[in-house]
Amino acid sequence: MKVPDTRHRHISHLYALCPGAQITKRQTPGLYNAAIKSLDLRGDGTTSWSRAWYMNCRARFYQPEKAYEIFTHLIDLQTFPNMFDAHRAMKKGSDEPLSWQMFQIDGNFGAPAAIAEMLLQSHVRLPDGSYEIELLPALPKVWANGKVTGLRARGGFEIDIEWKGGKLTNATLKSVSGEKAVIRYKEKVVTYPCPTGKSLHLDDELNNHKLTL
Protein backbone atom coordinates (compact mmCIF):
# COMPACT_ATOMS: atom_id res chain seq x y z
CA MET A 1 0.00 0.00 0.00
CA LYS A 2 1.37 3.40 -0.94
CA VAL A 3 1.59 5.88 1.92
CA PRO A 4 1.73 9.41 0.47
CA ASP A 5 2.96 11.18 3.62
CA THR A 6 4.26 8.92 6.35
CA ARG A 7 5.22 11.81 8.63
CA HIS A 8 1.90 13.66 8.69
CA ARG A 9 0.59 14.50 12.16
CA HIS A 10 -3.06 13.62 11.51
CA ILE A 11 -4.09 10.14 12.67
CA SER A 12 -7.87 10.27 12.31
CA HIS A 13 -7.75 6.74 10.90
CA LEU A 14 -6.75 5.57 14.41
CA TYR A 15 -9.80 7.05 16.14
CA ALA A 16 -11.12 3.51 16.69
CA LEU A 17 -7.98 2.80 18.73
CA CYS A 18 -7.98 6.00 20.78
CA PRO A 19 -10.11 7.68 21.99
CA GLY A 20 -12.37 4.95 20.64
CA ALA A 21 -12.21 1.34 21.77
CA GLN A 22 -13.10 -0.72 18.70
CA ILE A 23 -9.45 -1.69 18.19
CA THR A 24 -7.86 -3.51 21.15
CA LYS A 25 -4.93 -5.86 21.65
CA ARG A 26 -6.90 -8.95 22.66
CA GLN A 27 -10.18 -8.46 20.80
CA THR A 28 -8.90 -7.31 17.39
CA PRO A 29 -5.20 -8.28 17.24
CA GLY A 30 -4.89 -7.91 13.46
CA LEU A 31 -6.17 -4.35 13.41
CA TYR A 32 -4.22 -3.61 16.58
CA ASN A 33 -0.90 -4.64 15.02
CA ALA A 34 -1.75 -2.68 11.87
CA ALA A 35 -2.41 0.39 14.03
CA ILE A 36 1.02 0.04 15.64
CA LYS A 37 2.64 -0.17 12.20
CA SER A 38 0.72 2.87 11.02
CA LEU A 39 1.80 5.00 13.99
CA ASP A 40 5.40 3.81 13.69
CA LEU A 41 5.38 5.13 10.13
CA ARG A 42 4.11 8.51 11.33
CA GLY A 43 6.83 9.13 13.90
CA ASP A 44 6.01 10.94 17.15
CA GLY A 45 4.05 13.93 15.92
CA THR A 46 5.06 17.51 15.28
CA THR A 47 2.54 19.86 16.85
CA SER A 48 1.72 19.66 20.54
CA TRP A 49 -1.82 18.39 20.08
CA SER A 50 -0.61 15.57 17.84
CA ARG A 51 2.08 14.57 20.34
CA ALA A 52 -0.59 14.33 23.05
CA TRP A 53 -2.71 12.07 20.85
CA TYR A 54 0.32 9.95 19.95
CA MET A 55 1.15 9.66 23.65
CA ASN A 56 -2.34 8.31 24.32
CA CYS A 57 -1.95 5.81 21.49
CA ARG A 58 1.42 4.63 22.80
CA ALA A 59 -0.21 4.00 26.18
CA ARG A 60 -2.87 1.90 24.43
CA PHE A 61 -0.02 0.03 22.71
CA TYR A 62 1.58 -0.80 26.11
CA GLN A 63 4.68 1.18 25.14
CA PRO A 64 5.47 3.10 28.34
CA GLU A 65 8.95 4.29 27.40
CA LYS A 66 7.73 5.63 24.07
CA ALA A 67 4.80 7.38 25.73
CA TYR A 68 7.13 8.94 28.29
CA GLU A 69 9.55 10.08 25.60
CA ILE A 70 6.72 11.91 23.83
CA PHE A 71 5.70 13.43 27.16
CA THR A 72 9.20 14.82 27.73
CA HIS A 73 9.13 16.35 24.25
CA LEU A 74 5.83 18.03 25.08
CA ILE A 75 7.18 19.48 28.32
CA ASP A 76 10.65 20.44 27.07
CA LEU A 77 9.82 21.69 23.59
CA GLN A 78 6.15 22.60 23.44
CA THR A 79 5.13 24.09 26.79
CA PHE A 80 5.29 27.75 27.77
CA PRO A 81 6.85 28.75 31.14
CA ASN A 82 3.33 29.16 32.59
CA MET A 83 2.59 25.51 31.62
CA PHE A 84 0.25 26.51 28.78
CA ASP A 85 0.51 24.24 25.78
CA ALA A 86 2.57 25.81 22.98
CA HIS A 87 1.31 25.08 19.51
CA ARG A 88 4.83 25.09 18.19
CA ALA A 89 5.16 23.35 14.87
CA MET A 90 8.44 21.55 14.31
CA LYS A 91 10.49 21.62 11.16
CA LYS A 92 9.86 18.46 9.22
CA GLY A 93 11.99 15.57 10.40
CA SER A 94 13.50 17.38 13.40
CA ASP A 95 12.82 18.71 16.89
CA GLU A 96 13.69 22.25 15.83
CA PRO A 97 10.63 24.51 16.14
CA LEU A 98 9.42 26.91 13.52
CA SER A 99 9.44 30.58 14.48
CA TRP A 100 5.73 30.95 15.23
CA GLN A 101 3.90 29.57 18.24
CA MET A 102 0.62 30.10 20.07
CA PHE A 103 -1.39 28.72 22.97
CA GLN A 104 -3.51 25.69 22.12
CA ILE A 105 -5.35 23.87 24.89
CA ASP A 106 -5.40 20.45 23.21
CA GLY A 107 -2.03 19.46 24.64
CA ASN A 108 -3.04 20.56 28.14
CA PHE A 109 -6.04 18.24 27.97
CA GLY A 110 -4.41 15.43 26.01
CA ALA A 111 -1.20 14.93 28.01
CA PRO A 112 -2.92 14.45 31.41
CA ALA A 113 -5.37 12.08 29.72
CA ALA A 114 -2.40 10.09 28.42
CA ILE A 115 -0.80 9.98 31.87
CA ALA A 116 -4.06 8.57 33.22
CA GLU A 117 -4.06 5.99 30.39
CA MET A 118 -0.53 4.96 31.36
CA LEU A 119 -1.70 4.26 34.92
CA LEU A 120 -5.21 2.93 34.33
CA GLN A 121 -7.24 1.77 31.34
CA SER A 122 -10.87 0.68 31.24
CA HIS A 123 -11.91 1.03 27.61
CA VAL A 124 -12.15 -2.71 26.87
CA ARG A 125 -15.77 -3.80 27.02
CA LEU A 126 -16.44 -7.50 27.60
CA PRO A 127 -19.24 -9.55 25.99
CA ASP A 128 -21.43 -9.27 29.11
CA GLY A 129 -21.26 -5.47 28.96
CA SER A 130 -18.83 -5.00 31.84
CA TYR A 131 -15.53 -3.15 31.47
CA GLU A 132 -12.09 -4.59 32.14
CA ILE A 133 -10.11 -2.33 34.48
CA GLU A 134 -6.38 -2.64 33.84
CA LEU A 135 -3.92 -1.40 36.47
CA LEU A 136 -0.56 0.14 35.48
CA PRO A 137 -0.74 -0.91 31.82
CA ALA A 138 2.04 1.41 30.61
CA LEU A 139 4.18 2.37 33.60
CA PRO A 140 7.56 3.81 32.51
CA LYS A 141 10.75 2.90 34.36
CA VAL A 142 11.26 6.48 35.53
CA TRP A 143 8.03 6.26 37.55
CA ALA A 144 9.31 3.25 39.50
CA ASN A 145 7.65 4.26 42.78
CA GLY A 146 4.46 6.18 43.25
CA LYS A 147 0.77 6.36 43.88
CA VAL A 148 -2.28 7.94 42.32
CA THR A 149 -5.69 8.60 43.85
CA GLY A 150 -9.13 9.33 42.52
CA LEU A 151 -8.82 7.95 38.99
CA ARG A 152 -12.17 7.10 37.41
CA ALA A 153 -12.84 3.92 35.48
CA ARG A 154 -15.69 2.95 33.20
CA GLY A 155 -18.32 0.90 34.94
CA GLY A 156 -18.51 3.39 37.79
CA PHE A 157 -15.36 3.02 39.91
CA GLU A 158 -13.05 5.42 41.73
CA ILE A 159 -9.56 3.94 42.01
CA ASP A 160 -6.40 4.50 44.05
CA ILE A 161 -3.19 2.67 43.05
CA GLU A 162 0.21 2.32 44.71
CA TRP A 163 3.34 0.74 43.26
CA LYS A 164 6.99 0.21 44.14
CA GLY A 165 9.90 -0.93 42.02
CA GLY A 166 7.70 -0.74 38.96
CA LYS A 167 5.23 -3.26 40.40
CA LEU A 168 1.77 -2.98 41.89
CA THR A 169 1.66 -3.07 45.69
CA ASN A 170 -2.03 -2.36 46.35
CA ALA A 171 -5.15 -0.81 44.90
CA THR A 172 -8.53 0.33 46.19
CA LEU A 173 -11.63 0.37 44.01
CA LYS A 174 -14.77 2.14 45.21
CA SER A 175 -18.00 1.41 43.36
CA VAL A 176 -20.44 4.19 42.56
CA SER A 177 -22.70 2.03 40.40
CA GLY A 178 -22.89 -1.43 41.95
CA GLU A 179 -21.45 -3.13 38.87
CA LYS A 180 -19.09 -6.07 39.24
CA ALA A 181 -15.39 -5.25 39.04
CA VAL A 182 -13.26 -7.03 36.43
CA ILE A 183 -9.63 -6.18 37.18
CA ARG A 184 -6.50 -6.99 35.19
CA TYR A 185 -2.87 -6.62 36.20
CA LYS A 186 -0.47 -7.94 33.58
CA GLU A 187 -1.85 -11.39 32.65
CA LYS A 188 -3.96 -11.96 35.75
CA VAL A 189 -7.68 -11.14 35.67
CA VAL A 190 -10.07 -11.34 38.63
CA THR A 191 -13.75 -10.55 39.09
CA TYR A 192 -15.42 -9.34 42.29
CA PRO A 193 -18.92 -8.16 43.15
CA CYS A 194 -18.84 -4.64 44.54
CA PRO A 195 -22.09 -3.05 45.79
CA THR A 196 -22.61 0.68 45.45
CA GLY A 197 -20.61 2.62 48.02
CA LYS A 198 -18.39 -0.34 48.91
CA SER A 199 -14.64 -0.56 48.30
CA LEU A 200 -12.38 -3.44 47.29
CA HIS A 201 -8.88 -3.51 48.79
CA LEU A 202 -6.51 -5.47 46.57
CA ASP A 203 -2.93 -6.59 47.16
CA ASP A 204 -0.19 -7.10 44.59
CA GLU A 205 -1.76 -10.41 43.52
CA LEU A 206 -5.22 -8.84 43.15
CA ASN A 207 -6.49 -10.68 46.21
CA ASN A 208 -9.32 -8.81 47.94
CA HIS A 209 -8.63 -8.61 51.66
CA LYS A 210 -11.70 -6.68 52.74
CA LEU A 211 -14.87 -5.03 51.51
CA THR A 212 -15.54 -1.76 53.30
CA LEU A 213 -17.81 1.25 53.26
Regions found by a protein language model. Name each.
Residues 1-48, 69-87:
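Extended glycan-interaction surfaces of carbohydrate-active proteins
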Residues 2, 37-38, 50, 94, ...:
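A near-ubiquitous, low-amplitude feature marking generic local secondary-structure context
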Residues 10-14, 46-52, 62, 103-110:
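Aromatic- and histidine-enriched alpha-helix N-cap/loop-to-helix transition segments
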Residues 15-27, 53-62, 114-125:
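Well-ordered alpha-helical scaffold segments within catalytic/enzyme domains
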Residues 51-60, 89, 99-101:
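Conserved short loop/turn motifs at secondary-structure junctions
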Residues 65-213:
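Non-catalytic C-terminal accessory modules of carbohydrate-active enzymes
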